[in-house]
Amino acid sequence: MIFPGLAFAARATGEENALSQSTQPLLQPRGVAEMLDSLVASDGTGAHPHVRAGALSSGAQAMRNLAHAVHFLCLLHGRHPGVIDNAARKAVDPASRQWMDEAADAFVQERAFLSKIASAVGPVPSTQGQAQCEAAVAAQRKAIDMLAESDRHGCAVGAAIALTLDWRTIRVLLDISAQRLDMTP
């Protein structure tokens, strides 16, 4: 049985045997950490075609691509207060509040590093469709802010957790940028 609610629904409708005789393989139960890692891998920064193809770390356009990525990351996450700061204000549970405060303190250094790289990489390269890209990033920033400022139970802390999990990949991109710019992380 995968989900208790599914078993209840099957008993209520008399379909319990039909569910157990399904030709589809049963999903293996996974832990929360595995599910979150899977979501980050499939939908996070690392899933972007430029990241998967290595377009940010090698090739003739790598530095240009990195400059775009760094500037857009700075637009998304370089402001204060950011996702984690806003979510920390919403946290009422003592355990999540402590984690949020620690994460917000740590993110101060990450934001400073991001700003330092954005400054070192120079201006945003001029590209056809740049205005549309900036508008899309501004819309993403607004959506991220809405999640981080939400009063819905778990929404703000979920946004902070998602950013923290995805930051592992983002930090790799920042480290690659720092290396290419001869900066020390």
What are these regions (language model features)?
Residues S22, G31-S38, H50-V51, N65, ...:
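Exposed alpha-helical structural elements
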Residues F3-A53, A131-A136:
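Acidic, low-complexity proline/glycine-rich segments
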Residues V40-G46, L56-A91, Q109, S150, ...:
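Alpha-helical bundle segments that constitute or directly flank the non-heme di-iron/ferroxidase center
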Residues A95-P185:
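Active-site-proximal alpha-helical scaffolds that flank and shape metal-associated catalytic sites
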Residues M1, V51, L56, Q61, ...:
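Generic low-polarity alpha-helical segments
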Residues A18-G31, A55-A67, S150-G154, D182-P185:
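Short, charged, low-complexity loops and linkers
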